[in-house]
UniProtKB/Swiss-Prot annotation:
InterPro entries: Palmitoyltrfase_DHHC (IPR001594), PFA4/ZDH16/20/ERF2-like (IPR039859). One of its GO terms (molecular function) is protein-cysteine S-palmitoyltransferase activity. This is Palmitoyltransferase SWF1. Residues 127-177 form the DHHC domain. It is found in: Endoplasmic reticulum membrane. The chain crosses the membrane at residues 2-22, 50-70, 85-105, 174-194, 204-224. Disulfide bonds: none annotated. The gene is SWF1. The DHHC domain is required for palmitoyltransferase activity. Palmitoyltransferase that targets several endosomal SNAREs. Palmitoylates the SNAREs at cysteine residues close to the cytoplasmic end of their transmembrane domain. May have a role in the cellular quality control of transmembrane domain-containing proteins.
């Protein structure tokens, strides 16, 4: 039975990897059209798929709570301090509540969100959302899964099947931090109990230790990444845009005109004048520009992030709707 299961898993991995590349072949065509494309490419089909990861993580947390209270409580409880006995259920409840809030509290609408000024680098005025056909507010982004534009958009999180944006940052960050606290505490506390011989061969104890350790590491890494973005004064969505600008600079193609407006140099030249062609950093502007004596940008210090308020706390306050 195990070999059949292993064969099934390997075959599915192979089909997932190769079906996009060989989708014109009969062997892979059906799988690509009915499995790969609707699951991984088409946002509108099989929308239940977006609940698989949140459901999986909820099951992991529920299973860990089950192991602790139903399988290990009688043996572990005598070694816990009174403060710990109160801390554990409170932290579990807080993690659960912030998780539910992160899933079901949606970001606010564009008009209710903060109205940022364009920086003329990664956000430009009068840009129109190609899906909503409305003016794009700086720092917003259209989410094809949520099917609307999100103010101060960070990313669509697969762990909560919800966009993280202005209006639910406070719940999302609380959920991340509570996971870090609960899982790290559980992992370290169980580690201290390994000295007791009775626990070393207990399969439930080992299972709980491995699960809490693995997911605490995942939670810590992801939380660190999110808080670093806050410290840098950017969102996950903006980081991708800044990376593109930095890439232009590293390749020596980022320039500014006499007014300080940024452009990037194309590899092609004008067919008539043989002069280099420049494009705006505005991805919605496909016009060709001819610049006179443009200055090359040589350092990231020459590029100012208008949205960085200068400190972690100031950047964080800007995202918290409840503090507005």
């Amino acid at each position: 039975m195990f070999l059949l299961f292993l064969l099934f898993v390997v075959s599915q991995v192979g089909l997932l990897v190769f079906s996009p590349k060989f989708k014109d072949l009969i062997l892979f065509r059906w799988y690509y059209q009915h499995i790969y494309y609707p699951l991984f490419t088409d946002y509108t089909r099989y929308r239940w798929k977006y609940w698989l990861v949140p459901g999986f993580y909820a099951c992991i947390l529920i299973f860990c709570v089950h192991l602790f209270y139903n399988k290990l409580n009688d043996t572990v409880n005598p070694y816990l301090y009174s403060l710990e006995k109160a801390f554990i259920p409170i932290t579990i409840a807080f993690t659960s509540l912030t998780g539910v809030a992160s899933v079901f509290v949606k970001p606010l609408g564009l008009q209710a969100g903060p109205q940022f000024q364009p920086d003329y680098i990664i956000f430009h005025p009068s840009a129109v959302c190609q899906t909503c056909k409305t003016i794009k507010v700086p720092r917003s982004k259209h989410c094809p899964i949520c099917e609307r534009c999100i103010p101060l958009h960070d990313h669509h999180c697969i762990w909560i099947n919800n966009c993280v944006g202005y209006g639910n940052y406070e719940y999302f960050y609380s959920f991340l931090l509570s996971n870090c606290l609960l899982l790290t505490y559980a992992s370290l506390r169980l580690l201290t109990l390994f000295r007791i011989t009775a626990f070393k061969k207990d399969k439930f104890f080992l299972s709980l230790f491995l699960l809490t350790t693995a997911f605490s590491l995942i939670a810590i890494v992801f939380t660190y990444y999110q808080l670093k973005l806050v410290n840098d004064g950017m969102t996950n969505n903006e980081q991708d845009k800044w990376y593109l600008v930095q890439e232009y600079m590293r390749n020596g193609n980022l320039v500014k005109d006499m007014d300080g407006v940024l452009y990037y140099r194309s590899m092609s030249t004008d067919a008539q004048t043989a002069e280099p062609i420049f494009y705006s950093t505005n991805l919605y502007d496909h016009s060709k520009y001819h610049l006179i004596n443009p200055a090359k940008i040589l350092s990231h210090e020459e590029i100012i992030n208008l949205y960085d308020r200068g400190s972690f706390l100031d950047n964080l306050k800007e995202r918290i709707h409840l503090l507005d």
